[in-house]
Amino acid sequence: MYILGIESSCDETAAAIVEDGKHLISNVISTSVKEQALYGGVVPEIASRRHAEYISATVQQALQDANMSIADVDAVAVTFAPGLIGAVLVGVNFAKGLAYGAGKPLVPVHHLRGHIAANYLTHPQLEPPFLCLVASGGPSHIVQVEDWCKYHVLGRTVDDAAGEAFDKVARTLGLPYPGGPSVSQAAKTGDPHYYKLPTPHVEGKYNVSFSGLKTAVVNEVHNAQQRGEEVRVADMAASFQERIAQILAKKLLAAAADTNAKTLCLAGGVAANGRLRQLVNDGAQKLGAKVYLPELKYCGDNGAMIAAQGYYEFKDGNIADLTLNGLPTLAIDYR
């Protein structure tokens, strides 16, 4: 079964074709990230306009790369939540028109479910149940994936997202957008123990908070500038990355130990962070658990992950009609 996946929840306009939820046929991404970088982050209006400009050609290119036409596709899957609402609506409305015109089923896909499904593309042998840390520009979650379309949230971000914290710290340190790769690159030559950053405390054993950590970095930099001192950018980047990776890994591994989970996954943009991957791998080895990590190309937003999850949503009977609307927020375990 061939699924066309369409993604437009943030600043990537993406389309892909995936067979049976696990086998990539084509994958095309058009991004406005360079334009967004001029403003130090995503400007929703710019993102929406670029989606409207790029989406038709992006979908056409995905079909062309697969040597297919829309008639060869079995269903059209699209991100409908969560995300920047203007951006989401571009993808949803395009997918509705395409599916209706071609007489194909329309499959709504939750963006974070898509991130989890990116693991199926890298590891076709992976099957639920497993425990997954989803960390991205949106809320982080520790999720028990009980079945292909059944989820139980154990922990979540209570304030700022991990990706958002990376972007804010990058701006504070004068590093370019997007913040995740910039901070990681700067951290390579830094001392992760130079700055003593706090570990935020939060209610809920598996919940995470990054607002205080982000503020601590901003204050440290501001105070140094007020004193006329040089900010050690590489050391601050390394110290921040170490703290955020330690927090996320510790929560995931604690949940794994408490639930006796023997299969762990990472998903989302922050899953590309090398230090986080290392900490999770090391901790899982001590627990006797196996870790599955998505390829770096699947960590950011892409259409392939939406097509992959779209296959399982379709098999589960999650078919939408033309009343489908985009949503800015929606729990991953919605039903």
Locate each region found by the language model.
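Conserved phosphate-binding catalytic cores of ATP/NTP-utilizing and phosphoryl-transfer enzymes
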Residues: 109-130, 309
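Glycine-rich phosphate-binding/hydrolytic loop that grips phosphoryl groups
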Residues: 115, 294-333
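A short helix-loop
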Residues: 2, 8-9, 16, 26, ...
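Conserved phosphate-binding/catalytic loops in two-lobed NTP-binding clefts
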Residues: 108-109, 264, 281-306
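Short glycine-rich phosphate-binding loop at a beta-alpha junction
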Residues: 70-80, 260-270, 292-295
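A contiguous, well-structured pocket-lining segment that forms one wall/lid of small-molecule binding clefts
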Residues: 69, 185-264, 273-287, 314-317, ...
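Short Gly/Thr/Asp-enriched flexible loops that form oxyanion-binding sites at enzyme active sites
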Residues: 78-102, 274-283
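N-terminal beta-alpha supersecondary unit
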Residues: 2-82, 111, 115, 236
